[in-house]
């Protein structure tokens, strides 16, 4: 074998050198980005735990480790956390995994995929638009059960269409139901910040704990991964929806009691405000001593 064979551009080894060089560059860049992102992620977790008011509890005595377990002991924490996990899991599966699976099938074309995504997006937009008036009127547990019911209904319709190949039903029914369920599952936990002052501090602790434990490079939540490892629960999103629906029914009595106490407290605040305004108009109360306007707990989307 002559020396010209190694210098020939048609030789396989000479062709493989640029590929190996580009592969090394790609691996180096990826490793650099991973190191930087990991450092930033750890730094953000440290700052969240040290400086944010949600995790920095105003205390006089020393830190008690039992305070860190307060969100875990609360049933509402698990209820709304699983609700949010089911909603975000459905969102990522529908918009990231479903298009690739549908385009890989011979009977599915791109003309069917576009209306499917379009109808689901429209359903999510309209549902999120009216959540601000629906949640204060019906209550968070009722809206939560409705959203989980929509997710389960979408799963049943998808199973029916897979068996009988009813593509039009899948486009116009299951996607709309899934979109409504996703928007509801994401909106209801966020409404806790404005729905009740009794749950405000607990919601902040739960959100901070969830943000500190979540991984930004994972699209699937830890609960979905844990449920998938159980074996029979292959479709984890609908399993989470069923669990949330059951938990919401269990906490129905407790939620109704808390809502009654909250309504009584809110009525008392409104009564004090009206009384102070009437005294101010009569000149019997100075403006500085007038009670402030009571807080309204209606949830509004940006």
Swiss-Prot record:
Its main location: membrane. It is found in: Cell membrane. GO terms for cellular component: plasma membrane. It comes from the Bacteria. Gene3D superfamilies: Multidrug resistance protein D. Keywords: Antibiotic resistance, Cell membrane, Membrane, Plasmid. One of its GO terms (biological process) is response to antibiotic. The keyword Cell membrane applies. This protein is thought to be a membrane-associated barrier of drug uptake. This is Chloramphenicol resistance protein. It comes from Escherichia coli.
